[in-house]
């Protein structure tokens, strides 16, 4: 009997970054060659990690294993990173490998832990120049997550968020309050500094009769209300002060692990919370524009599994611009067809 080979095994390239099974500075190991019975551990040079990575494969093909190996390399190279995991297994696996020397670097975000809810306020703004970006991104997240959407809904929601951002300690819970409580709305509008935003509330919105106003805000109340009605979500985004500062985590090379287990949170809530977190990381990276020299922006690695669940319209912007802010993405999913066309173009143009 003759066994026919369908392909020829080639010798690994001479320039392949090999580690010899040991920790090697400057290399992130993730595989083994077995040419002619000789096993050699190899990886990717850390300098090449400055480019984004896209990992694709169906369930059981090793995506999570590869993500874990790359993350472990960041841990042992004392680099900062964030993990956004919609399943929970990847996040819990990483927690097991955190060495004692880096335990104090870790922020573990687990919404399912209702006894110890960690605060995360997507509307918390440290730089007043970022208010416009924050408003646009929050609208983008909600738009991505809801099937029915209209221009009037987006118009009112945008001015609602812009008004709330001028008052410290407001949260997403205040969106519905702004649209239903006259006294609260007046207090917020009194704090508004942008003349266009103020005119919307004092002239345009104030001119609407009760019936028209009720019909106009109803879709927002339905959509935002459904999200904040979940006590698990409300315990987190209802806190005016975030327990952690994403920009500080990035600049100091710390670790942020986000466990968004869909089995515990529900698929819709996990998707919105994940999109809000990815958006917060994006905005924090963009705020690094206040560091003049690109080389002074500490490298930070963001890992997003099943990233199509969290990809808003601006995700393409993250992929195309994040590197200059020191944010390096590694994203994974199962099928190319899961990505919206604009995100697909950005992925293949920047990885």
Please name every model-derived segment:
Residues 1-30, 231:
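An aromatic-glycine-centered, glycine-rich loop/turn in mixed alpha/beta architecture
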Residues 30-38, 46-48, 58-59, 66-327, ...:
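P-loop NTPase motor domains
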Residues 41:
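Conserved pre-motif I regulatory segment
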Residues 52:
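Walker A (P-loop) ATP-phosphate-binding motif of ABC ATPase nucleotide-binding domains
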Residues 86, 332-338:
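Conserved H-loop
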Residues 345-351:
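A short helix-turn-beta junction within AAA+ P-loop NTPase domains corresponding to the substrate/partner-engaging
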């Amino acid at each position: 009997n003759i066994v026919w080979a369908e392909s020829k095994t080639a010798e690994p390239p001479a320039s392949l970054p090999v580690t010899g099974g040991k920790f090697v500075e400057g290399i992130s190991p993730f595989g083994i060659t077995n040419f002619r019975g000789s096993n050699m551990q190899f990886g990717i040079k850390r300098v090449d990690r400055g480019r984004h990575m896209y990992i694709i494969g169906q369930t059981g093909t090793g995506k999570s294993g590869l993500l874990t190996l790359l993350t472990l390399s960041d841990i042992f190279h004392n680099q900062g990173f964030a993990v956004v995991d919609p399943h929970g297994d990847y996040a819990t696996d990483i927690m097991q490998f955190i060495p004692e020397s880096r335990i104090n670097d870790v922020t573990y975000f687990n919404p399912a832990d209702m006894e110890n809810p960690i605060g995360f306020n997507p509307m918390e703004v440290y730089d007043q120049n970022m208010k416009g970006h924050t408003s646009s991104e929050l609208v983008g997240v909600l738009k991505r997550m809801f099937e029915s959407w209209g221009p009037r809904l987006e118009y009112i929601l945008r001015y609602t968020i812009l008004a709330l951002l001028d008052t410290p300690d407001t949260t997403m819970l205040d969106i519905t309050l702004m649209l239903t409580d006259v006294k609260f709305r007046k207090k917020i509008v009194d704090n508004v500094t942008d003349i266009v935003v103020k005119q919307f509330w004092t002239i345009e919105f104030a001119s609407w009769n009760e019936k028209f106003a009720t019909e106009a805000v109803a879709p927002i109340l339905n959509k935002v209300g459904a999200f904040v009605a979940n006590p698990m979500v409300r315990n987190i985004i209802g806190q005016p002060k975030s327990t952690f500062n994403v920009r500080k985590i990035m600049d100091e090379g710390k670790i942020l692990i986000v466990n968004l287990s869909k089995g515990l949170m529900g698929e819709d809530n996990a998707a919105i919370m994940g999109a809000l977190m990815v958006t917060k990381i994006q905005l924090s990276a963009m705020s690094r524009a206040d560091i003049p020299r690109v080389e002074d922006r500490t490298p930070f690695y963001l890992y997003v599994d099943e990233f199509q669940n969290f990809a808003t319209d601006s995700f393409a912007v993250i992929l195309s611009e994040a590197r200059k802010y020191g944010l390096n993405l590694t994203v994974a999913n199962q099928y190319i067809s899961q990505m919206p066309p604009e995100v697909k173009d950005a992925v293949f143009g920047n990885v």
